[in-house]
Amino acid sequence: MKVGLVLEGGGMRGLYTAGVLDVMMDNHFMPDVVCGTSAGVTFGVNLLSQQKGRVLRYNCRYVGNKRYISLHSWLTTGNMINKDFAYDLLPRSLDPFDEEQYERSPAVFYATITNMHTGEAEYVQITNTWEQMDVIRASASLPIICQPVEWNGEKYLDGGLADNIPLDKCMELGCDKIIIVLTRPAGYHRNDHISGVCHLFYPRYKALLKTIANRNANYNARIEQINRLEAEGKVFVIRPSRHIEVGRLEQDADRLRALHALGVDDALGVWEQLESYLHKDGI
């Protein structure tokens, strides 16, 4: 049996995912493969480093701090999420990320990024977070409010533009048991309208603009696929059991705590079912 874990993006809605991952750590659960996008990457790496509570702790501690996520950072650096603070000072000094434990993990971790030239998703195995911090940052570089990230001679943006729920990659890697953590409740239908604005910011990147234009349809089709596979018992889905109003760049620490608590409660509520799914068919 090869177990995969798929982590949807969603900015600060990823605090729900962090709650689910904290329950996994409490239960000493580690998949063989993790495929994440955006916040599913920046928060998901903490499962491999076994740092329960870290995502909630640093987000609640620094939310509202203009050095972290702020209009001030956007106006002065071009990045609403300040790259020097979020991807250097914070993980190295303020709330250190345990790279040694990450590298000891038996799991492999893939980050999804969107190539601006091709408009396609690329999946990069993260073997060392410090050496590949640009990939991690690219996966969560939201269009317009974050600068593109250059890596290996190409420019990249948020992986969620091309593949917000990297299920196909997880299947391609041979996982026969797949757990999917979503950040939207059942029945959510994407209908955002960023395509027109992106034409003003990225007029030279025609393939990227096409990907963005198709983003709603592709996301909704992915959810339909997941719902079908879930009904067939082929994947196990953990999603918010109720709606909590949390924005992509939420600045209210109480809302973040509430969403994290919901992730914990939902994961605990389905844990026995998850174990049954993993051991079904006599495995």
Question: Which positions does each model-derived feature cover?
Answer:
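Patatin-like phospholipase
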Residues: 1-37, 45-283
